[in-house]
Amino acid sequence: KLGQLYPNQKVLLVDAQLAGEGASSRNSGYLVDTTLNDGFTSNKELENYKKKADIYKIGIKAVKKFIKEHQVDCDWNECGKYFASSKIQDENILENFSKTLSKLGFENEFIYKNDLSNKLGTKFYNVAIYTKGGILIHPGKLVRAMIDTLPKNVYLFENTPLINWQKKRNSIKCQFKNSHVQADKIIF
């Protein structure tokens, strides 16, 4: 995205290993619209949660647009997400979370042991909230597609672990095994 926003700037992506081949890329991944919270004590906290949820929504929309534009097969599955617990005493936490979700307009459903085991295929969990907004993807496939479509001003350096970094006046110097980079702005 930075390459698109700043087409006249060089953008370097540096990965310690092959991009899209790390542990997170080998697992299933979720794009989420909500994260678990057991309730809020103030309207300010609720506003902050809503801001986070809005960011998640923007992210999901951007990824969906990308996979459509580039016809990416990343096993996109709008299956929703379960916030589940094996402890029945966690029902109160989930009730508070359900109230928060409802206040913010997120559909959610309480599911208990028998129905839950039918849906999940295990009797381990006792209680859960189901939300529709979670999307299961294969992150490795998505990352590799993003790598294949990098803008011309974005350069990828793989198998390049960061050895050291230090701030020098108005810039940051990053030291790698056989090279270094000095830049005004760096995102770690």
Task: Annotate each PLM feature.
Residues 98-104, 123-185:
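Helical element adjacent to the flavin cofactor pocket in flavoenzyme catalytic cores
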Residues 22-55:
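Glycine-rich active-site loop/strand segments that organize a redox cofactor
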Residues 8-10, 71-73, 105-107, 153, ...:
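A generic structural signal for alpha->beta connector loops
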Residues 37-41, 65-145:
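Flavin (FAD/FMN) cofactor-binding and adjacent substrate-gating region
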Residues 188:
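Flavin (primarily FAD) binding-site architecture
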Residues 56-63, 143:
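Short, hydrophobic/amphipathic alpha-helical packing segments
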Residues 3-26:
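Glycine-rich FAD pyrophosphate-binding loop
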